[in-house]
């Protein structure tokens, strides 16, 4: 059965890292007879330059028609001065919303070979393996009303709205419990229920959903405490479920526990596990075109795609094992390099993963 994947290289280092991910995907397709068809288009700044919009209508239709979307990265300083509604990031928000991608999965897994890359002591992070599940289409990033107004005294005031409906909370909570069931059977719901009305409803609905999952140990934590605990004792967590803004912040924080955001993939899924897959890192315009970016997060995003959307666990395992082999060989891109290891570029790292498959 043919599987159509929409490839969106994006901006900055996006095209470079995507080229390596496609190399790996092509090889694994041959080895496991997946029947993959690749379709290419643009998103973000590259789409603005080509279509005059960060997400063209025809691109959105291609995304809807595809079984999965693989994205590089979006954004760059050359688009900082354009209409805010046309900024690259708006294309990313729109495609997530239009495809109904409400669940963002961001693992923070520390490879043993990279234990020294973390800024925390090895005993604090060794064996780290947690998953942050972020609600992606609701909350303050999409809430209305929002804007800037001038008060009677002439002062400007900006305002945003943080709404969450019961159904939005229920579906992400259910996803959190399901993910915990596949892992260590622990779920920590992070909110700010001591201050925010939306968080009070969040906590109440999560408690209601918990009744259907008696085998899962549920805990609640305020977001400020969660940020502190991620640094103090991150291994206490298995799955964290939280809202859009809190998840945005905490997942970036958790990514650095591993030493390099260049190692971390992510998945954004709809109710049927159709998804968009992308590295956690940004477009890194400062190193774009130099051939030194780390492609491993994008390659590992391919593994997540095979696991969650296509249910090809063996193929996903093979990619993850190949990445481990390459790290065992001492190959490192600049962001994860240390004394005694071999520094390689983007293409060489991709080739090494292909060779290890």
From Swiss-Prot:
Subcellular location: Cytoplasm
Site (Important for catalysis): 141, 192
Major place of residence: cytoplasm
Sequence positions that bind NAD(+): 76-89, 282-294
Necessary cofactors: Mg(2+); Mn(2+)
Keyword Metal-binding among record annotations: yes
Identification of the protein by name: 3-isopropylmalate dehydrogenase
Species name: Xanthomonas campestris pv. campestris (strain ATCC 33913 / DSM 3586 / NCPPB 528 / LMG 568 / P 25)
């Amino acid at each position: 059965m043919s599987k159509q994947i929409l490839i969106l290289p994006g901006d900055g280092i996006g095209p470079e890292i995507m080229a390596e991910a496609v190399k790996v995907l092509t090889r694994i397709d041959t080895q496991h007879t997946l029947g993959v068809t690749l379709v290419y288009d643009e998103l973000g700044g590259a789409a603005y330059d080509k279509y005059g919009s960060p997400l063209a209508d025809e691109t959105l239709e291609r995304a809807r028609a595809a079984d999965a979307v693989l994205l590089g990265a979006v954004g760059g300083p050359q688009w900082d001065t354009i209409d805010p509604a046309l900024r690259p990031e708006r294309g990313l928000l729109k495609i997530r919303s239009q495809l109904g991608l409400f669940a963002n999965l961001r693992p923070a897994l520390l490879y043993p070979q990279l234990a020294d890359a973390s800024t925390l002591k090895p005993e604090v992070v060794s064996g780290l393996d947690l998953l942050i599940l972020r609600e992606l289409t609701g909350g303050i990033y999409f809430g209305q009303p929002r804007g800037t107004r001038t008060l009677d005294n002439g002062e400007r005031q900006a305002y945003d709205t943080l709404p969450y409906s019961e159904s939005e909370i229920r579906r992400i909570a259910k996803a959190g419990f399901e993910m915990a069931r596949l892992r260590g059977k622990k779920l920590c719901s992070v909110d700010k229920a001591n201050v925010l009305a939306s968080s009070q409803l969040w906590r109440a609905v999560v408690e209601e959903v918990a009744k259907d999952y008696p085998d899962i140990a549920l805990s609640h934590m305020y977001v400020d405490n969660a940020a502190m605990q991620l640094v103090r004792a991150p291994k206490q967590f298995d799955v964290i479920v939280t809202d859009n803004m809190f998840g945005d912040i905490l997942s970036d924080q958790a990514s650095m526990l591993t030493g390099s955001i260049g190692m971390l993939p992510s998945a954004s899924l709809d109710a049927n596990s159709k998804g968009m897959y992308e590295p956690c890192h940004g477009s890194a315009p400062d190193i774009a075109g130099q051939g030194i970016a780390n492609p491993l997060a994008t390659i590992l995003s391919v593994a997540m795609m095979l696991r969650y959307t296509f249910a090809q666990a063996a193929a996903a395992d093979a990619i993850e094992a190949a990445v481990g082999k390459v790290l065992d060989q001492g190959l490192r891109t600049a962001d994860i390099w240390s004394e005694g290891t071999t520094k390689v570029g983007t293409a060489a790292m991709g080739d090494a993963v292909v060779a290890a498959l």
